[in-house]
A protein has these predicted regions:
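Glycine-rich acetyl-CoA-binding "A-motif" of GNAT/NAT acetyltransferases
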Residues: 7-10, 71, 98
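Conserved beta-strand in the GNAT
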Residues: 7-15, 26, 30
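Conserved beta-strand-loop-alpha-helix junction that forms the acyl-donor binding cleft
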Residues: 36, 62-72, 90-95
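Conserved acetyl-CoA-binding loop of GNAT-fold acetyltransferases
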Residues: 77-87
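Conserved acetyl-CoA-binding loop-helix of GNAT-fold acetyltransferases
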Residues: 31, 37-54, 73-78
Length: 108
């Protein structure tokens, strides 16, 4: 059932920084290849927004969204995230080439 699908997904929510920037959180997500296309990423990000607020964070920030990850970028924008800009060549790919990254944030 779908319950088994959810057992193979996760996210990690943590402070993006410490001290005066400690109210900004960051998250990492993992969705198994076999579970893609089931809108689980959307459920994880939505839950993360709720949990971040519940734990006293004011902003959820994604530091390194790869520019070519159009599915994630579309999802984040649909959920109300705002792109901060573009960092040219900010992500080193497995083949050694570099790709732009697009930081995003969402006020909680």
């Amino acid at each position: 059932g779908l319950g088994d699908v959810y057992k193979r997904q996760l996210y990690i929510l943590h402070p993006n920084n410490v001290g005066r920037c400690g109210h900004i959180c960051n998250a990492s997500y993992a969705v198994s290849k076999g579970s893609r296309g089931l809108h689980i990423g959307e459920k994880l990000v939505s839950d993360c927004l709720l949990e971040g607020k519940k734990h006293g964070f004011g902003v959820l920030q994604f530091n390194a969204v790869v520019a070519s990850n159009v599915h994630a970028r579309h999802l984040y924008e649909r959920l109300g995230f705002v792109q901060l800009g573009t960092i040219p060549g900010g992500f080193r790919m497995k083949d050694g080439s570099y790709e732009d990254i697009c930081p995003y944030y969402h006020v909680l």
